[in-house]
């Protein structure tokens, strides 16, 4: 029973096991007490139901509490997870933001270091603090605080203010001006505004910049001068990049000190006269730029396009106070524009002077040694009209005037001998329009540095278009070289107007003393009274047959413009009577008597009758005396004179008889005889003391040469030794061909044969410059024939 009673408790405790046990005990003991059990079960059935409800409710409460706890726990875990995620995300975002910020700052500082010159010049990359410090120093230097003293004046290191100003204005080709930003009043303008705008400084001082610009540009100028943020509206064109930007992007910088201004406006051009000295190449460019806006109507102002660039500066500067009478003094601190105005280069096609200024006047060509074109500059089309392919492979002589072809050939031969030196020659060039253009060609040779051989000749051909320059006349129309004296070595293209003043006076003096054939009718000598003589000889007018040997370049390379200028067609016949009276053909011996007398000493081998010795004018004696003193003493020998003992003689001139046709005259001076292809002569057109002498022919052109002697040998001019007489050293080994027999031409031949006398022409020029000296017998100790006289 106890067990039975215990079973219900057990069943009550575990209700799910009660029915199972009751139903699972069909034994008699259980069956015998089944009623009780059933009753007990029945009796407690309600209680069992309540217990089950209570047990169920207990389990439900436990489940609810557990679920609530789980929910709370899960809720707390979700909150914690979300907060942790938020914190993690926040930390990640902050790190990312900081990393991006550091990257941006590094990029900006790197860009700043590239912009600062002191940073970029360092060998290794500086740290950020150094970059910032150098950037601040650079900004201070840009604002001028680094080079200004306490009074605010600029102190350059090595230039003064005036030198710096002139250098800046010359380099910029413009003018400097300072304008008040508030009122537009011109504070300062440089004097270079006159050559740029043809306006004096006085017109700018006291006026405003608005008065100087075009009326349509006043508003734009006011916007550029304004420093307020709301002054500009709309969009702004950046001249540097060519992009259109909104003004809001730059408005914050308009009040910044040192902000840059760059704009284009039209300024009024004045009519003041410009100094001719300042009319240089830049002035031509200015005139071309001024014409860029088209033609100017009568009575209307002329405007030109000016590009203004500058910076906004504080005015007055720090530490500088304006005077009380200044109208701007009471307005307090303000700003001003410091800018440079330059003429904007225009490319307007309607410029009338573009064709004249921009048309090239020269071109470069390359030739071989024969003168054939191997390269031609493209500017030859505008200069001479030919295309480059039309000139390539052709000789430049083919385009030269026939009278100048020999001159051009000789110049090419001469430039080859000069080896790198520049040689200039002037000739007439045939253009494509069949016109003759005066061309000045400056040529030099290019040598291979390894083989030292001449590769080609480079020529710069310039078209001379100066109408005031007279063309070079032919040789037949020029003054004879023998009369020009020291000016004979000048270029043929130079006229008498181009000679130095001293040489002009020298030339006029000699021309007065040696008159032409038109002015030789009356010539009175102070010592000898002579009568007019005349002669005619056909043999003396024969042309020179070997002029090319006479004027070859190997005679004297220092005079390339004298010898090549004589062409074959210009060599005319000349008679021996064309020798001027003031020039000596050769020197005589020292055995002349002091008084003039019939020339028994001169014997022409029976061909020449006795004639009268005529004393020439004093200038010839002076010239020959000075030439003889400066001759080379190294050539002196026993029968010849040295530079210290050789006296100078005037020419003792005798007439040549017309009957001497087969051989030239021979002169006997005591025992001194020499054969010559020419004869000395007295002054034509002057009276002589002898009435039976033959007459000389009239003077022909002086520009040609003496006829050669038939059958003469090359050694015909070699002097023969004699007693008490000497021979000029330049006659030894001399060629048989001579030009007009003047002392200057003999000196040239002497120089060609005596290289030890390189300065004889310079000495001769210096000697002939002053002819005012007085010569007497003291200067001629070996002569008694010259009485004291003064010129």
Curated annotation (Swiss-Prot):
The modification Phosphoserine is found at residue 77. Changing residue 136 to D: Impairs heterodimer formation with EPAS1. Impairs heterodimer formation with HIF1A. Significantly destabilizes ARNT?s heterodimeric interactions with both NPAS1 and NPAS3. Compromises SIM1:ARNT heterodimer stability. Changing residue 448 to A: Decreases heterodimer formation with EPAS1. Decreases heterodimer formation with HIF1A. Impairs heterodimer formation with EPAS1. Impairs heterodimer formation with HIF1A. The modification N-acetylalanine is found at residue 2. PANTHER family: CIRCADIAN PROTEIN CLOCK/ARNT/BMAL/PAS. Residues 112-168 are annotated as: Required for heterodimer formation with HIF1A. Pfam families: HLH (PF00010), PAS (PF00989), PAS_11 (PF14598). This is Aryl hydrocarbon receptor nuclear translocator. Monomer. Homodimer only upon binding to a DNA. Efficient DNA binding requires dimerization with another bHLH protein. Interacts with TACC3. Interacts with HIF1A, EPAS1, NPAS1 and NPAS3; forms a heterodimer that binds core DNA sequence 5'-TACGTG-3' within the hypoxia response element (HRE) of target gene promoters. Forms a heterodimer with AHRR, as well as with other bHLH proteins. Interacts with NOCA7. Interacts with AHR; the heterodimer ARNT:AHR binds to core DNA sequence 5'-TGCGTG-3' within the dioxin response element (DRE) of target gene promoters and activates their transcription. It comes from Mus musculus (Mouse). One of its GO terms (cellular component) is nucleus. Keywords: Acetylation, Activator, DNA-binding, Isopeptide bond, Nucleus, Phosphoprotein, Repeat, Transcription, Transcription regulation, Ubl conjugation. Residues 1-14, 465-490, 498-508, 631-646, 653-667, 742-756 have a biased composition (Polar residues). Residues 89-142 form the bHLH domain. Residues 424-467 form the PAC domain. Residues 539-554 have a biased composition (Basic and acidic residues).
């Amino acid at each position: 029973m106890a067990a039975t009673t215990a079973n219900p408790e057990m069943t009550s405790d575990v209700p799910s096991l009660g029915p199972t046990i009751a139903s699972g005990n069909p034994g008699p003991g259980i069956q015998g007490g089944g009623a009780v059990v059933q009753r007990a079960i029945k009796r407690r059935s309600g209680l069992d139901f309540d217990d089950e409800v209570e047990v169920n409710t207990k389990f439900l409460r436990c489940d609810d509490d557990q679920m609530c706890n789980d929910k709370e726990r899960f809720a707390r875990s979700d909150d914690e997870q979300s907060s942790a995620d938020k914190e993690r995300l926040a930390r990640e975002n902050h790190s990312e933001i900081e990393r991006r910020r550091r990257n941006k700052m590094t990029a900006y500082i790197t860009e700043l270091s590239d912009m600062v010159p002191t940073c970029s010049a360092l060998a290794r990359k500086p740290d950020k603090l150094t970059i910032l410090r150098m950037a601040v120093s650079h900004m201070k230097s840009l604002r001028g605080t680094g080079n200004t003293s306490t009074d605010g004046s600029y102190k350059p290191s090595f230039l003064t203010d005036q030198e710096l100003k002139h250098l800046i204005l010359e380099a910029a080709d413009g003018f400097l001006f300072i304008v008040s930003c508030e009122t537009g009043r011109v504070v300062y303008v440089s004097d270079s505004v006159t050559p740029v705008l043809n306006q004096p400084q006085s017109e700018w001082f006291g006026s405003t910049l608005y008065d100087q610009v075009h009326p349509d540009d006043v508003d734009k100028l006011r916007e550029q001068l304004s420093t307020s943020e709301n002054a500009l509206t709309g969009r702004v064109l950046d001249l540097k990049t060519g992009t259109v930007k909104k003004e809001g992007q730059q408005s914050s910088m308009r009040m910044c000190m040192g902000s840059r201004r760059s704009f284009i406006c039209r300024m009024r051009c004045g009519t003041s006269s410009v100094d001719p000295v300042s009319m240089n190449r830049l002035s031509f460019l200015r005139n071309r730029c001024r014409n860029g806006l088209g033609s100017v109507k009568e009575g209307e102002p002329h405007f030109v396009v000016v590009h203004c660039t500058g910076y906004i500066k504080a005015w007055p500067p720090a530490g500088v106070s304006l005077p009380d009478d200044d109208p701007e003094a009471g307005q307090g601190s303000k700003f001003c524009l410091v800018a440079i105005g330059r003429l904007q280069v225009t490319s307007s096609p309607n410029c009338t002077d573009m064709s004249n200024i921009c048309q090239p006047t020269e071109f470069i060509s390359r030739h071989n040694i024969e003168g054939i074109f191997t390269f031609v500059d493209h500017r030859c089309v505008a200069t001479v009209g030919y295309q480059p392919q039309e000139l390539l492979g052709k000789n430049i002589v083919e385009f030269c005037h026939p009278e100048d072809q020999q001159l051009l050939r000789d110049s090419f031969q001469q430039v080859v001998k000069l080896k790198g030196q520049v040689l200039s020659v002037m000739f007439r060039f045939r253009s494509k329009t069949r016109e003759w253009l005066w061309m000045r060609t400056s040529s030099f040779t290019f040598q291979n540095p390894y083989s030292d051989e001449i590769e080609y000749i480079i020529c710069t051909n310039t078209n001379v278009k100066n109408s005031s320059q007279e063309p070079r006349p032919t040789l037949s129309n020029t003054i004879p070289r023998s009369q020009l004296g020291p000016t004979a070595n000048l270029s043929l293209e130079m006229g008498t107007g181009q000679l130095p003043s001293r040489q002009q006076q020298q030339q006029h003096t000699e021309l007065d003393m040696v008159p032409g054939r038109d002015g030789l009718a009356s010539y009175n000598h102070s010592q000898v009274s002579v009568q007019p003589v005349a002669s005619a000889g056909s043999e003396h007018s024969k042309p020179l047959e070997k002029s090319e040997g006479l004027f070859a370049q190997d005679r004297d390379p220092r005079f390339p413009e004298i010898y090549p200028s004589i062409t074959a067609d210009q060599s005319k016949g000349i008679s021996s009577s064309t020798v001027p009276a003031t020039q000596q053909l050769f020197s005589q011996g020292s055995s002349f008597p002091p008084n003039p007398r019939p020339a028994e000493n001169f014997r022409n081998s029976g061909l020449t009758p006795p004639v009268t010795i005529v004393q020439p004018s004093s200038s010839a004696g002076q010239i020959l005396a000075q030439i003889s003193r400066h001759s080379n003493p190294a050539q002196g020998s026993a029968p010849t004179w040295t530079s210290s003992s050789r006296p100078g003689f005037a020419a003792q001139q005798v007439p040549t008889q017309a009957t001497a046709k087969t051989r030239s005259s021979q002169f006997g001076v005591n025992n001194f005889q020499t054969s010559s292809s020419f004869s000395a002569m007295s002054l034509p057109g002057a009276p002589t003391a002898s009435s039976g002498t033959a007459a000389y022919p009239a003077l022909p052109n002086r520009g040609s040469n003496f006829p050669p002697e038939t059958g003469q040998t090359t050694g015909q001019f070699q002097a023969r030794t004699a007693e008490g007489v000497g021979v000029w050293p330049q006659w030894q080994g001399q060629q048989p061909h001579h030009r007009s027999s003047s002392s200057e031409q003999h000196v040239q031949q002497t120089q060609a044969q005596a290289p030890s006398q390189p300065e004889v022409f310079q000495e001769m020029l210096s000697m002939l410059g002053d002819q005012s000296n007085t010569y007497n017998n003291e200067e001629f100790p070996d002569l008694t024939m010259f009485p004291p006289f003064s010129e």
